[in-house]
């Protein structure tokens, strides 16, 4: 039986069965052991202690020995009657070590919080510097674009004047219309004539290119954050081409989502059916294996009987 039994002759109190009792171990000192042995109660004792030499492995129950050193109390039923397992003493840590550990944890937490605050402050400073640098860059771009705009506007005026002069040639003079107020208004033909000279054509092309560059610069200055993507059409995002059942594009509707969920459920149901079929086939194979083993055993028995008959000449 697991546990400890009292060493008093005729006493069978067990530490595993009698949980209400306490059990005491004899001390190491020989004088104390002799004193304990003298103080053992003789009530119900069927033998004598004249030749008994107690050791530290002997236990006394609280029925025959009052006091002493309490060594073992059964709290939970156990199957380990070993002294090292049942009487393992819990190593008590000093209170100072626990307090030092708590202080160390608090210091580590404070250091982590300080590091996080410093990182946040650095990020805020970087954002402020970026915000301050962006307006200055935009003003510098506009200052650089102003002379280009002036030169482009002058070139445009020159080309318009040249077209007006060419349209007022001797063969193409048209009467000026008269407004209801009586003022003469001269029409300006802005269409490009084929009879332009080579120099005028080159000047017009240069002016047009400068005008395009100036307008592009103005658009870039008005948008300091850089060129923006303008999406034209019904679909807000391009098709990435991912068409497997787990991909959800941004334009997924409720019907498509339900359809995909139903597909997944169908797949799971099919997998469950396949698993049931596999379990049935495994069970059938096991039954077949048992039958074959039984047949083999029967054949071995018959063969053994035949060999025995041959040996005995039956």
Swiss-Prot record:
Residues 93-111 have a biased composition (Low complexity). InterPro entries: THAP_Znf (IPR006612). Residues 85-111 are annotated as: Disordered. It is found in: Nucleus; Cytoplasm. PROSITE patterns: ZF_THAP (PS50950). Transcription factor, which has both transcriptional activation and repression activities. Also modulates chromatin accessibility. In complex with HCFC1 and ZNF143, regulates the expression of several genes, including AP2S1, ESCO2, OPHN1, RBL1, UBXN8 and ZNF32. May regulate the expression of genes that encode both cytoplasmic and mitochondrial ribosomal proteins. Required for normal mitochondrial development and function. Regulates mitochondrial gene expression, including that of components of the electron transport chain. Transmembrane segments: none annotated. A zinc finger (THAP-type) spans 1-80. It comes from Homo sapiens (Human). A motif (HCFC1-binding motif (HBM)) lies at residues 243-246. This is THAP domain-containing protein 11. SMART domains: DM3 (SM00692), THAP (SM00980). It is linked to Methylmalonic aciduria and homocystinuria type cblL: An autosomal recessive disorder of cobalamin metabolism clinically characterized by early-onset seizures, and profound global developmental delay with severe intellectual disability. Metabolic features are mild methylmalonic aciduria, low-normal plasma methionine, and high-normal plasma homocysteine. Spinocerebellar ataxia 51: A form of spinocerebellar ataxia, a clinically and genetically heterogeneous group of cerebellar disorders. Patients show progressive incoordination of gait and often poor coordination of hands, speech and eye movements, due to degeneration of the cerebellum with variable involvement of the brainstem and spinal cord. SCA51 is an autosomal dominant form with age-dependent penetrance and genetic anticipation. Expressed in skin fibroblasts. The gene is THAP11. Residues 255-305 form a coiled coil. One of its GO terms (cellular component) is nucleoplasm. It comes from the Eukaryota. Forms homodimers. Interacts via HBM with HCFC1. Forms a complex with HCFC1 and ZNF143. One of its GO terms (molecular function) is RNA polymerase II cis-regulatory region sequence-specific DNA binding. Its main location: nucleus. GO terms for biological process: cell population proliferation; electron transport chain; negative regulation of neuron apoptotic process; negative regulation of transcription by RNA polymerase II; neuron differentiation; regulation of mitochondrial transcription; regulation of transcription by RNA polymerase II. Keywords: Activator, Coiled coil, Cytoplasm, Disease variant, DNA-binding, Epilepsy, Intellectual disability, Metal-binding, Neurodegeneration, Nucleus, Repressor, Spinocerebellar ataxia, Transcription, Transcription regulation, Zinc, Zinc-finger. Pfam families: THAP. Belongs to the THAP11 family.
């Amino acid at each position: 039986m697991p546990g400890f039994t009292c060493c008093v002759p005729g006493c069978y109190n067990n530490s595993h069965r009698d949980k209400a009792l306490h059990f005491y171990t004899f001390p190491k000192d020989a004088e104390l052991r002799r004193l304990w042995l003298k103080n053992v109660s003789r009530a119900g004792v069927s033998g004598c202690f004249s030749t008994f030499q107690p050791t530290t492995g002997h236990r006394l129950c609280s029925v025959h020995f009052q006091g002493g050193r309490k060594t073992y109390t059964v709290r939970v039923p156990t199957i380990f009657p070993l002294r090292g397992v049942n009487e393992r003493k819990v190593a008590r840590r000093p209170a100072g070590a626990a307090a030092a550990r708590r202080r160390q944890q608090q210091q580590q937490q404070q250091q982590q919080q300080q590091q996080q605050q410093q990182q946040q402050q650095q990020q805020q400073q970087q954002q402020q510097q970026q915000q301050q640098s962006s307006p200055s860059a935009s003003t510098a771009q506009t200052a650089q674009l102003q002379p280009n705009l002036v030169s482009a506007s002058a070139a445009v005026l020159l080309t318009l004047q040249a077209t007006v002069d060419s349209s007022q040639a001797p063969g193409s003079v048209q009467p000026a219309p008269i407004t209801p107020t009586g003022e003469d208004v001269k029409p300006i033909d802005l269409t490009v004539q084929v009879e332009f000279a080579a120099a005028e054509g080159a000047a017009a092309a240069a002016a047009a290119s400068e005008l395009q560059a100036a307008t592009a610069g103005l658009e870039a200055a008005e948008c300091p954050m850089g060129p923006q993507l303008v999406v034209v059409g019904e679909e807000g995002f391009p098709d990435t081409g991912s068409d497997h059942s787990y991909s959800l594009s941004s334009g997924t509707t409720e019907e498509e989502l339900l359809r995909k969920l139903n597909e997944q459920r169908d797949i799971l149901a099919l997998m469950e059916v396949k698993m049931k079929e596999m379990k049935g086939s495994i069970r059938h194979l096991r039954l077949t294996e048992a039958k074959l083993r039984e047949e083999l055993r029967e054949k071995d028995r018959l063969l053994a009987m035949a060999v025995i008959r041959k040996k005995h000449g039956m």
